């Protein structure tokens, strides 16, 4: 059996899948906040419980909300303080007596979508999350491409370019600080949070993404103008990403992926930001939603 974990700041979810990635069992618990040992204990206990339930020694894949250094096995997960900068893979492997694999949650999301029957026709699937943050996962022929140390796909930490700053207005463009230590990272603009901050700073009113989108569909001029600007900002940024990576398909996840107008507007806005000979990839909504993380974590053992 394939065990997939979605490790979050507030909850830890285990889902058990068969080798066809069909879910057999799920359990969620609160994320311990008191100590690293307690955090490890919770994961070990969930694995041992699943082993007993399914009378097997299942494979263990982790989806983590941060960067996993594949050279050192250290995970940088700042929103889970007790496990940040710890040798998670080594410690869990020793405790469980088996190999443990881990990737960041964006890679797991992308891997889950790449293993969907409809997407297996595409050699290169790019998954993009437009949620609390903006991140990416690169899947080549059904396998995560994580680069030299595991940093490939950290697209949220690319920075706004000349055309994006010109679009926002040289004298009024809001420049946001990013948690990575840099400024003007895509994570702070193309995420759901960035969508809201841009509206506030450019239009002078604090609204939720849901409220902005509702006003857009109600033909509110301010919201319509803002969405047009946001689509153009996305097209500029995705144009750079597509030029560099040339994916066959882009799958969008996260809260903003439910804004259906994106799938109509982005393919029309992209060509002017690409080379003449470039091909606009298929852009589609994620199929597995909140289940993508655990499903992709489980699929780590189908791909290496």
Curated annotation (Swiss-Prot):
GO terms for molecular function: ATP binding; N-acetylglucosamine kinase activity; zinc ion binding. Belongs to the ROK (NagC/XylR) family. NagK subfamily. Gene3D superfamilies: 3.30.420.40. ATP binds at residues 4-11, 133-140. The keyword Zinc applies. HAMAP family: GlcNAc_kinase. This is N-acetyl-D-glucosamine kinase. Keywords: ATP-binding, Carbohydrate metabolism, Kinase, Metal-binding, Nucleotide-binding, Transferase, Zinc. Transmembrane segments: none annotated. GO terms for biological process: N-acetylglucosamine metabolic process; peptidoglycan turnover. Its EC number is 2.7.1.59. The gene is nagK. Catalyzes the phosphorylation of N-acetyl-D-glucosamine (GlcNAc) derived from cell-wall degradation, yielding GlcNAc-6-P. Pathway: Cell wall biogenesis; peptidoglycan recycling. The keyword Acyltransferase does not apply. It comes from the Bacteria. It is an enzyme of class 2 (transferase). Zn(2+) binds at residues 157, 178, 180, 185. NCBIfam families: PRK13310.1. It catalyses: N-acetyl-D-glucosamine + ATP = N-acetyl-D-glucosamine 6-phosphate + ADP + H(+). InterPro entries: ATPase_NBD, N-acetyl-D-glucosamine_kinase, ROK, ROK_cs.
